[in-house]
């Protein structure tokens, strides 16, 4: 997962190019779902760049609310990674974080649209793509609580605990469809404006822990399904935007402004295609 700010949406907004549907995978579901719910690119950019991601990625309450014993224990901190044995089996946590703070952020981000049950009833029809962890199949959310669909789509294995909803377990949609061209086609669109960020492989020095290894495995799976999607793009009518994010990686949330600027520059390069 890398930053995905709506580069093409920002430019199409300026050029007054109508957007009839939005489809998003992983961080793209956060961006796409927010845009479909009515947020302007400017407001979305402001929210994403100003939020404290360190707080979002911490399931703990503020330190001021800790009991005295825990505050004292924090003077000699240890790595909090719970491992245990139950019924003779090794038990590990489902993810580094449960994602409670992230879910609250999503709820607030699309406030006013979180009660819309059919995504076709949003200001712009929307689909979020996730992976069904039980059978490995692609899951396309077209209804339900919007923040839940967004959270399910970007439940990066190893980082976030899987999302359980409607009797199913979901993880990041990038595992099966990082560039959901076929989903957009099925919604009946004539022209697709796609943003392919790719996953990018982590350098060796970042593969020394479980999150690094998990991230690399996800990147490998993602890069295997993207070429299939790229073949579905019609160069005569569709527009493909490929920002060069350089060394900006999945965890560089503090570098969101750089990622946005790079994305906007890439979108402007294809402005003639967007205007045709």
How should each PLM-predicted stretch be described?
Residues 1-25, 33-276:
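Patatin-like phospholipase
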């Amino acid at each position: 997962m890398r930053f995905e700010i709506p580069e093409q949406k920002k430019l199409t907004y300026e050029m007054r190019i109508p957007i009839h549907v939005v489809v998003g995978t992983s961080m793209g579901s956060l961006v796409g779902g927010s845009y479909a719910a009515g947020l302007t690119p400017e407001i979305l950019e402001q929210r994403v760049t100003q939020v404290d991601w360190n707080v979002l990625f911490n399931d703990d309450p503020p330190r001021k609310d800790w009991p005295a014993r825990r505050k004292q224990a924090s003077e000699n901190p240890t790595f909090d990674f719970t491992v245990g044995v139950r019924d003779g089996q090794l038990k590990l946590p489902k993810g580094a974080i449960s994602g409670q703070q992230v879910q609250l952020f999503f709820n607030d981000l699309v406030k006013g649209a979180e009660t819309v049950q059919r995504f076709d009833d949003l200001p712009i029809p929307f689909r979020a793509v996730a992976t069904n962890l039980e059978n490995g199949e692609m899951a396309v959310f077209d209804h339900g609580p919007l923040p839940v669909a967004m959270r399910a789509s970007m439940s990066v294995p190893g980082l976030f605990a899987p999302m359980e909803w409607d009797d199913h377990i979901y993880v990041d949609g990038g595992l099966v469809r990082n560039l959901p061209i076929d989903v957009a086609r099925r919604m009946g669109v004539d022209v697709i404006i796609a943003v392919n960020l790719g996953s990018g492989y982590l350098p060796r020095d970042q593969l020394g822990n479980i999150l690094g290894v998990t991230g690399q495995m996800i990147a490998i799976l993602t890069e295997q399904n993207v070429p299939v999607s790229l073949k579905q793009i019609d160069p005569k009518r569709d527009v493909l935007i490929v920002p060069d994010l350089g060394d900006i990686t999945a965890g560089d949330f503090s570098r969101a402004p750089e990622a946005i600027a790079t994305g906007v520059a890439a979108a402007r390069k294809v402005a003639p295609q967007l205007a045709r």
